[in-house]
């Protein structure tokens, strides 16, 4: 999901909320502009009810959306960036065969992402990041579009402006 997070976050001086949910808790941080950087204003953490999240997917949508909406209302922030739960993402570190053009490498990376989730490329979002060193290695990260759409719907139901949905942050921890 190609969100230009840095650009979206930098375009306004409004406060920004960041949400990270695990299988049993949620953490919401509020950042405010401090010149050219961001300053931590608030940090809230609360437990999630059993069944609200199941394997990175939203299991009980309405109570989770209501809780998120109330938490955001308490902060007064409407702009939100979220990290997908680690269980919602797949990742792998792959060694690239040598001598390939950019187009051939891109097609290979796409096939690898589709193989990770065992789904057609049209059913997922993916990204690849070159790792330093030789031989050339890539970290491929992906999530299914239906999971991404669930999380985008959660932000919409909570009444916030989603400026970033990050699978890279979570999936990179699995690699």
Each model region followed by its residue ranges:
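Short, surface-exposed recognition loops or helix-turn segments adjacent to catalytic cores
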Residues: 123-131, 160-175
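A short alpha->loop->secondary-structure connector
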Residues: 35-40, 97-109, 156-162
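Internal amphipathic helical hairpin motif
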Residues: 61, 84-141
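Short glycine-rich phosphate-binding loop at a beta-alpha junction
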Residues: 16, 68-70, 75-87, 155, ...
């Amino acid at each position: 999901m190609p969100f230009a997070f840095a650009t979206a976050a930098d375009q306004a001086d409004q406060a920004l909320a960041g949400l990270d949910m695990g299988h049993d808790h949620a953490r919401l941080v509020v950042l405010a502009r401090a010149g050219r950087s961001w300053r931590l204003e608030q940090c809230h953490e609360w437990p999630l009810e059993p069944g609200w999240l199941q394997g990175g997917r939203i299991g009980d949508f309405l109570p989770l959306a209501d809780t998120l909406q109330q938490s955001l209302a308490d902060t007064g922030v409407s702009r939100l960036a979220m990290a997908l739960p680690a269980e919602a993402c797949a990742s792998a570190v792959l060694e690239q065969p040598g001598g390939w053009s950019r187009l051939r490498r891109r097609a290979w990376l796409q096939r690898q992402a589709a193989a990770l989730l065992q789904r057609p490329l049209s059913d997922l979002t993916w990204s690849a990041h070159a790792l330093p060193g030789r031989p050339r290695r890539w970290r491929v990260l992906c999530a299914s579009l239906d999971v991404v759409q669930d999380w985008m719907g959660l932000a919409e139901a909570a009444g916030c402006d989603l400026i970033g949905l990050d699978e890279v942050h979570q999936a990179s921890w699995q690699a």
